[in-house]
Amino acid sequence: CAGIGSFCGLPGLVDCCSDRCFIVCLP
C-alpha cells in the first residue's frame, strides 16, 4: 500500500492499506 492516509481511486475512497485496494493509490 502507498501508506496510511492514502486512498485508492475508488468512489468510496477505500484505504490503501486495505486488501480491497486494487486501483492505483492517490496521495
UniProtKB/Swiss-Prot annotation:
Keywords annotated in UniProt: Disulfide bond, Ion channel impairing toxin, Knottin, Neurotoxin, Secreted, Toxin, Voltage-gated sodium channel impairing toxin
Disulphide bridges, residue numbers: C1-C17, C8-C21, C16-C25
Tissue localization of expression: Expressed by the venom duct, in the proximal part (indicative of a defensive role).
GO molecular function list: sodium channel regulator activity; toxin activity
Main location: secreted
Subcellular location: Secreted
GO cellular component, one term: extracellular region
Role summary: This toxin activates voltage-gated sodium channels (Nav1.3/SCN3A (EC(50)=3.98 nM), Nav1.4/SCN4A (EC(50)=4.99 nM), Nav1.6/SCN8A (EC(50)=1.27 nM) and Nav1.7/SCN9A (EC(50)=2.42 nM)). It shifts the voltage-dependence of activation to more hyperpolarized potentials but has only little effect on channel inactivation. In vivo, it induces nocifensive or pain-like behaviors in mice when injected intraplantarly. This is coherent with the specific defensive role deduced from its proximal position in the venom gland.
Family: Belongs to the conotoxin O1 superfamily.
Domain notes: The cysteine framework is VI/VII (C-C-CC-C-C). The presence of a 'disulfide through disulfide knot' structurally defines this protein as a knottin.
Protein name per its UniProtKB record: Delta-conotoxin SuVIA
Species this chain originates from: Conus suturatus
